[in-house]
Amino acid sequence: SVMDNNGLEYATGVAKGVSNVGNISGDVPTYVISDDLRAKFELKGFAASLNPTDPTDAALYPGKEGYTYGAKNNLKLIDMVGLDYNDPKWDLLLDELKLSEMHQLFNKSGWGSLAVESVGKPKTYEYDAPHGIANFLTDAVIYSYPCATMTAATWSQDVQRIYGNAIGEDAIASNTEGWYAPGINIHRTPFGARNYEYYSEDAVLTGLCSAAVCAGVEAHGMHAYIKHFVMNDADTNRAANGCVAVWGTEQATREIYLKPFQYSIQKGGAQGIMLTMCRVGWQFTFGSYPLMSAICRNEWGWHGCYITDYTTTMKGAGADQYLAAGGTLIHATAEQSLSDVKSGWCRKLLREAVHQILYLSLIHI
C-alpha cells in the first residue's frame, strides 16, 4: 500500500535532483538549429503564412478595379437565409459593403462582431470560459458547470450532449451568439496549467466529448469556438520570447492533436475555432496557411470563422500573416490594422473573411 516503504512520503514529498527548468535528471539540454531554420523564424507578413499564391499576381489579386463597394443591390443579410455558402447571391451582398466596413469586421471583433448598417447585420455577442458562459457585459443569469476532465471521466456522449444543451439554453437567455469553448487540447503532462479546460490525453475520447458538446451548443443557435488550435500544451512562454515552439511529426499531429478538432467540426458541427499563441515548428499557429486553410478549409470543407486573441502581434505584419493564412476575426476592441488594406491580396482575402463572418451569423436561422 501507499503507507508501506515510505510510500506516503514519496507520494507527497519534494522530488530530489530535479531542476525547475530542466528535465527529470536535472540537466538542461541544448539544441542548435540550422541557419535556414533560424531564418524562417524571422519571416513576417504574407511570406510567413506559407500561402502558396503570389501576392503580386494581379490576375489573382486585382486592385480596386476588380471589386465593387457600396453598391445598391437592395439586399440585406436576412435575404441570405438558407443559401449555400457558394451561392452567387453572396457576391451581390458583399458588393454593398464598403472596404472600411470589411476592415473593421475583420480587425475589431472583441467579445462579438460589429453591426453593419449597410447590409442590416446586427451586433453579436461572444463570451469566454470553457465551463459556462462568462457573460460580464449584461445582468443575465448564467451557470457554471463541471470541468471538462470530470465530464470526460463519465465516458458518456449523452452527458456531453446534455452539457451542450444546457449551455445552449444559457446562450438564449443571455443573448450570446458565440462561446470561446470547449477546450480540446491534449493532456501532455499533469503540470499543464489548463488541463482542467481540456478533456483527456486521448484524442478520440476528447474528440467525441467535444463533438457532442458542440452539437448541443450549435443546435441552440450559438457557435462553439473550439480551442486552442493547435498543440497548446504549455502556458510558460506561450506568448513571450517569440512564443514557445511545439514540434511534432505530421502523423502525431494528425492522429493526436488535430483529431479532436476534426471530430468537433465533422461530427459536432463546430463553426468557430480559437487559435493558440504558440508556434508549431517555427510558424505561428495563428498565421499558418498549411494548418488553417490547407487542412481545415480545403481538406475538411470547413467554412467557419477563426478568431485570435493574440492582439499584441495583430498590427501590420502580424495581421497580414493572419489574413493570408485564412484568418477571420481578431479578438480586439481597438482597431488592429493591416499594413496595406488597399492592396489587391488584402481586398480579396478580406472579402472572403467577411463572407465567412456573415455566413456564420445566419447558419442556424
Specify the residue positions occupied by each region the protein language model found.
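Glycoside hydrolase catalytic-domain context in secreted enzymes
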Residues: 1-363
